[in-house]
Amino acid sequence: MIRTKHLISIMLVLTLLFSSSALAAKPKATHTPPPAEITKEIVEPPEEIQHLLEIVYNEWQTVNGKDQGKKNKYTAWYNDYPWGKNKWCAGFVTWCMLEAGIPQAYEKDVMALEEGVAPEKFYHVTSSKPTTMVPGYLHMHRTSEIPQKGFIVQYGQKNNRYTHVGFVYDVVPNADGTYRLSCIEGAVLNTVRM
């Protein structure tokens, strides 16, 4: 009896293994392109990003430390409601990207793209807050621990919560392999700061 059950079990397994559905042609795997190579050398940004940095710098100079309030030109692209005090850093980043003409899409549209793929050389995740901006960049595989001028810097907490974003304006490598960054950020003490 035990031998018969063993034989039936083996036959059942073999039948399943060699059934037509098991032998059906499987779809071919698609080629995954290698991630963009990120250099460890500090390089000058491309013309489009240099233009973006000029806009960012001009905003810093124009604002000159003045309080921008809870509703300002950096938030108007999203809505006309007052934002929380010091809560418009991602709005500032997106406003600058819009001014520079950088192509972009909202996070839900970016997340609908194939992972690791962005439709343009330069592409921004339109967002009014860091918590939706950063996941879109992660989805496009556009993150790095090697800073470059024009990159978006994101700050977070140990609980993996993204709390603030800004622009890397300048990078100076230190002898110990770390970097000194100069950043321009919106919503720092309710103004634009470097």
Q: Where are the predicted features?
A:
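Bacterial N-terminal signal peptides
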Residues: 10-19
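...with weaker cross-activation on analogous glycine-rich loops/strands in unrelated enzymes
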Residues: 103-193
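N-terminal capping segments
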Residues: 29-105
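Sec-dependent signal peptide cleavage junction
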Residues: 18-34
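N-terminal compositionally biased, intrinsically disordered segments and leader/signal-like regions
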Residues: 5, 16, 31, 40, ...
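N-terminal cationic leader/targeting segments used for protein routing and processing
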Residues: 6, 27-29, 191
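Bacterial N-terminal signal peptides that target proteins for export
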Residues: 1-8
